[in-house]
């Protein structure tokens, strides 16, 4: 009966029971919705001295330089003649990442967006070494540049100027002035006129629609005279919603606007716009790169190589006001570093002037300022000191630690996304995930099989992460979590510090106290005693004790021992599921669910066999079958109804946990992980077994209830409610006040209602249980009514009035019990058939077949014709010709079935939504608390049995104040 067979959709399929009616219950397969969302990644470690930009979200490789320009990577630019000239560049590489490629490479997800914290230090140091000159590129065809006058001239908005790859900004300014007529009568090549204007690279938002307003530049950069605008234009593109154009402005005005914009960007700090980044890239790649100011003791900084003479001659022209500000800021930072050196011990005795400019780089790396608006991790112990960084900043709400790895060859699945790369051999590709939203606390979740410790304790499932907590990854890495956004709202002392640091030993008991937390053995014993006797809804166990614990809970529920509340077994089992989902390893929950479902199935099967032995279907010959009374059927079905109620709530609770598992996998990008897929398959099998238990208990319950109703329903057609001296009861009357012929049937309904209420069955299942009982009653009574009218005079007005009265009394009583709507719906066809028979004879003789079909559409043509053809009009009188069906409906009358089918009952639909189990707050039910204490002490005894005899002791008892 509880077969493991399943349909294609995944729902279980049951064999038919030996019922007096055809009972087939289908359960629609419940699908768990998958939700997930991925977070974008972008940020960098703050560095006040960096002038190299971080990569944009869509990096574009710079085009090869013209033949006479030597182009180097931005992160590797080094002034000839002095190492200190590129000091700021190298520091910028360390904290911001160079523009020449990421650690991930082109094939790695986000390879062009990796941060300096994800790179290896040798790769960054290698960027300082000189590189061979890049090969020259092919000639670029001429292009047309639109140069806007930006209010300098009236008339056309822009002028088109022909430019080549060798055209400089100064040459294009001269040509644009000539096109706009701003030369003032002098030649276009007049240097005084050209010097008064500058070509600007502007970024802004275009006007929307017709007449939507003027185009306004929000970011501006003055091109140096020697820069090539045609090459600058090809270096990068504006993001959606932005527009880029070249503008002709007065040189003084352009410098003032650029300086104001640059000052605003400096005030923004790390979050300045990416325009500053693109400005440096454009200037470097188009031949106008500004060289760092020479440091102390360095050479003149004159560039060498191809085109060096030209660049040295135009050096002053290529520097903008913003670049001069950079040089001044670098000098001030260098002075502060020298001042820090002078404050070192022994500075008064010896002059601390480093001869090697690299000493300034090393000192700058030590002067790290932690971010003030993002959580970060402080490295306490690493794997390779030469490659590990000190601060790892969380750039997204979800931060992933791991080793990374190549893309999977099967199915082309991408490599796992990792924010911080750790190269220790025991670090998994995705080791652990930290989620830190706007509100504390943060959550840390280890990946499957990843060794992770939290404040020195092994971490198996998700846990809260507070500022100051220690997070250990593998055997090498140890981090401290910091969140400057909390503003001191976290705990005053980290939980891993001793509780009483520096306190004097209180006495001999100090020798038996814990050195880590500072608690004595007595204090720890009191904490254990508080757990064993506490009312918190927590049940802790080890995996080795799982089988004994689950078996004890199911055995106690099956035997009915104790006075547990109706949903007590489901509550205890849900506590086991919750402990496994929160505390134990990731793969433990599917195994626990499978074992739990099998135990419940076996217990229900044993109970069904016991009831079947006491109520056999086939009785021995000569032994009359004794019908079940409402009281007897209530006693027999109570264990099954209890299991149906508990399994329904447990199923809803387990579905929530499985849905959480899928959501977490989607958020971490592990939805296609083979181990996760295997876990979900095991969970589906466990859910299918619980479905099977619910449907089987429902099937057996309605079987015995309908079996009892089968012997009581005929009285509704035969009994006369108008007996001598009897008064008809009103709505809401008690069962004892009802006519004797109706009491047995109403007694079955009342017993079922009380049983489902006492067992706290889900309201949806209560409605479906009575829906099936009313469906069976309607079909059984209607079939009996059709059958009785064939051989004897039964269809009479007087008999119909008695049946109508009995039916009204039953419906009124069910209305008072809260079941009126369901009863009215399922008794509709019987009510219509009885209403037809209650029509007075004179009125019925005036009706025609078409009018009767219109007034009683629920009856089939065969049923209507059967009632009319056997209606008793009087001795020797037959039905009138007006009652004959037309030829179009004659076939339906002759071939139609007058009996109702029992196989058209509504299917069983399992309840959806959240579970009614409440696992928050203290346990208020005393019986449930006693059972919880008993199970905790059982687990304590199992743990003590594993210890040597001389180490065992009884459960601790909390000391009374």
Swiss-Prot record:
Gene Ontology biological-process entries? angiogenesis; branching morphogenesis of an epithelial tube; negative regulation of autophagy; negative regulation of membrane permeability; negative regulation of Rho protein signal transduction; positive regulation of cell population proliferation; positive regulation of integrin activation; regulation of GTPase activity
Q: In which tissues is it expressed?
A: Detected in kidney, heart, skeletal muscle, small intestine and lung.
Q: Where is this region: Disordered?
A: 1-21, 35-70, 96-116, 261-352
Query: Which residues does the UniProt record annotate as the domain Dilute?
Result: 594-895
Keyword flag Chloroplast:
no
Pull one GO CC term from this UniProt entry.
Answer: Golgi apparatus
| Comp. bias regions, Basic and acidic residues | 1-10
Where on the chain is Phosphoserine found, per UniProt? Answer: 274, 286, 320, 322, 325, 413
Q: Which residues carry this modification: Omega-N-methylarginine?
A: 96
Q: Which UniProt keywords apply?
A: Angiogenesis, Cytoplasm, Golgi apparatus, Methylation, Phosphoprotein
Quaternary context: Interacts with Ras family members that have been activated by GTP binding. Interacts with HRAS, RAP1A, RAP2, RRAS, RAF1 and RRAS2. Interacts with MYH9 and ARHGAP29.
Role played = Required for the proper formation of vascular structures that develop via both vasculogenesis and angiogenesis. Acts as a critical and vascular-specific regulator of GTPase signaling, cell architecture, and adhesion, which is essential for endothelial cell morphogenesis and blood vessel tubulogenesis. Regulates the activity of Rho GTPases in part by recruiting ARHGAP29 and suppressing RhoA signaling and dampening ROCK and MYH9 activities in endothelial cells. May act as effector for Golgi-bound HRAS and other Ras-like proteins. May promote HRAS-mediated transformation.
Under PANTHER family, the record lists: DILUTE DOMAIN-CONTAINING PROTEIN YPR089W, RAS-INTERACTING PROTEIN 1
Name it: Ras-interacting protein 1
Q: Which organism is it from?
A: Mus musculus (Mouse)
